[in-house]
Amino acid sequence: MIGTFTYLDPTIQADPNLLFFYFDFDAFFASVEEIENPELKNQPLIVGNRTSRSVVSTCNYLARSYGIKSGMPIAKALELCPQAIFATSHFRNYRKYSAKIFAMIAEQFNLEVHTLSIDEGFVCFRDLSPRKAFSLAKRIQRHVYEQLNFHISIGISNQFTLAKIFSNQAKPFGVKSCFSKEVKRKLWPLPIVELPGIGKRQLDNAFKNNFHKIGDLAKCKDVTLFKRVFGIAWESLHAVALGETYTQSEQDVKSRSIAVSETLEYLNYSSNQLQQKLTSIFNELYARLQLSFQMCKGVVVQLKSNDFIVNSHSQSIKKYTADYQTLLVIVKKLFNRLLMGVGLNIRLIGVSFFGLKNNPSSSRPEGLLFYEYQQAKPKQQTAHFALDQMIYEINQSFGYEIIQRAKKLAAS
């Protein structure tokens, strides 16, 4: 295997020894419609319903040459290109071709591919040189086109966010890279709209305060201005502009997240059986969260299909929580969303909690780290930890939250 990336924690974005390929399929829905209906080729094609209140789902590049873009009202699109051809969405076909493309990349090039959406994904390498990376990206791109007739664009960087940005710069059917030492030359001249995570309000505020290029953000030293213009996202946006996208070591990543995964014994589980497996995995993970006296800021659910494609969805939570029901609802929602795209042919299920911090309502003695608490001598231990262990073991046998602490019942 050329490279693997197996952490469930989505906060990892950069590491000097890592290199990311970010795949973005070009006009994917429109390309699928053209493959299924060859008569649509070489015509301005819009995917969406031809009604005045609808919006453009996506369109091919010929339609884009008229100024049409995703999210545009259909009425406006028809003003720009009255001769446009329409195709209704066929999500089953989109999922089918998406799976084919990702499976081909994984199998042909012996890579572990992580899908982020139906038409975006990434692979991660360790110690791959930029020259070899570019050559490999072109080979992947060419192979997908020759075998399946799809164009994909690829961004390459030692930082995840930069790889994503430059996959968009590479469109259509290109490969572009940007490494840390190239940020001033390649990243700074780009308009700030290219930064992931900037909303319309932030963009308007940015223009009013003379932030037009990414370089304008990078050069700004006024933290107060940054906070006023970009809100809580100012720090991460500034880091991206500097090419310093949240670097951390593998050990740091592991310590800030906990995960439980299970490889399934059989490949023909029913939907109900998969739901039961998910609940069992969640219960084990939740017990670990309780016994570590921590709360989390987000959840990731990961599925590996029979063709070894890794699919994951994550959700950040507004407030830190260690609430069982809150976390279970999020996990099930993410799982069901993934299942719609992947189907029942599942090889592995994984769940993780990320963004961990100490839970102030836990019963651990103040100032004592978890590993110190576990390894403390009997005279130094309190009865709280033993009680938590007992509650955990009973609930493991008879169902979660059958036994709870009185203060938790009072709070609810």
Swiss-Prot record:
UniProt signal peptide: none
One record GO biological process: error-prone translesion synthesis
Domain of life of the source: Bacteria
Domain UmuC, first and last residues per copy: 20-199
An annotated GO cellular component: cytosol
Any one Pfam family match given in the protein's UniProt record, by short name: IMS_C
GO-annotated molecular function: damaged DNA binding; DNA-directed DNA polymerase activity
Family the entry assigns: Belongs to the DNA polymerase type-Y family.
Protein name: Uncharacterized protein MG360 homolog
